[in-house]
From Swiss-Prot:
PANTHER family with a match to the protein in the record: D-AMINOACYL-TRNA DEACYLASE 1 (PTHR10472:SF5), D-TYROSYL-TRNA TYR DEACYLASE (PTHR10472)
Gene3D superfamilies: D-tyrosyl-tRNA(Tyr) deacylase
Enzyme class name: hydrolase
Similarity comment text for this entry: Belongs to the DTD family.
The organism of origin for this protein: Magnetococcus marinus (strain ATCC BAA-1437 / JCM 17883 / MC-1)
Name of the protein: D-aminoacyl-tRNA deacylase
Function field: An aminoacyl-tRNA editing enzyme that deacylates mischarged D-aminoacyl-tRNAs. Also deacylates mischarged glycyl-tRNA(Ala), protecting cells against glycine mischarging by AlaRS. Acts via tRNA-based rather than protein-based catalysis; rejects L-amino acids rather than detecting D-amino acids in the active site. By recycling D-aminoacyl-tRNA to D-amino acids and free tRNA molecules, this enzyme counteracts the toxicity associated with the formation of D-aminoacyl-tRNA entities in vivo and helps enforce protein L-homochirality.
Motif (Gly-cisPro motif, important for rejection of L-amino acids): 138-139
GO BP field: D-amino acid catabolic process
Catalytic activity: glycyl-tRNA(Ala) + H2O = tRNA(Ala) + glycine + H(+); a D-aminoacyl-tRNA + H2O = a tRNA + a D-alpha-amino acid + H(+)
Major subcellular site: cytoplasm
């Protein structure tokens, strides 16, 4: 499971001209589910994102999480983060999970982030052609990569 996490002052997702998800201060998470991802990756990614300390405290040090600041998280599925570029110039997406299972894990991820960690979650629309708008705060961008299970 891979995630590109961006600290934002605002972010939104538009599908066919309609805003389907939006947040104010918080995080934008672009999430890719890979073949072999399971419960271990799901739980760890939920914890990592909810507890990632990338917001400034009163001294200006990155020491607070999105939970600490009572921020929001916009989660957008993005299978292209699973691109394999080891050969040639055209990306291979063979590492990405098949859509039906990927969608189930994506929705489970969003639900757990909200229910288990108490974070307000907005979502993109899985599998849709989306326009993502954001104001990156900092900018702060963090790459999280949790390898799939063996076998």
């Amino acid at each position: 499971m891979r995630a590109l996490v961006q600290r934002v002052s605002e972010a939104s997702v538009v599908v066919e001209g309609q805003v389907v998800g939006a947040v104010e201060r918080g995080l934008l998470v672009l999430l890719a589910v890979e073949r072999g991802d399971g419960e271990k990756q799901l739980e760890e990614m939920v914890r990592k994102v909810a507890r990632l300390r990338i917001f400034p405290d009163e001294a200006g040090k990155m020491n607070l999480s999105v939970k600490d600041i009572e921020g929001e998280v916009l989660v957008v599925s993005q299978f292209t983060l699973a691109a394999d570029m080891r050969k040639g110039y055209r990306p291979s997406f063979s590492l990405a999970e098949e859509p039906k299972r990927a969608e189930a894990l994506y929705l489970d991820y969003c639900q757990r982030l909200n229910q288990h960690e108490g974070v307000v979650v907005a979502q993109g629309l899985f599998g849709a052609d989306m326009q993502v708008k954001l104001i990156n705060d900092g900018p702060v961008t963090i790459w999280l990569d949790l390898p799939p299970q063996e076998g």
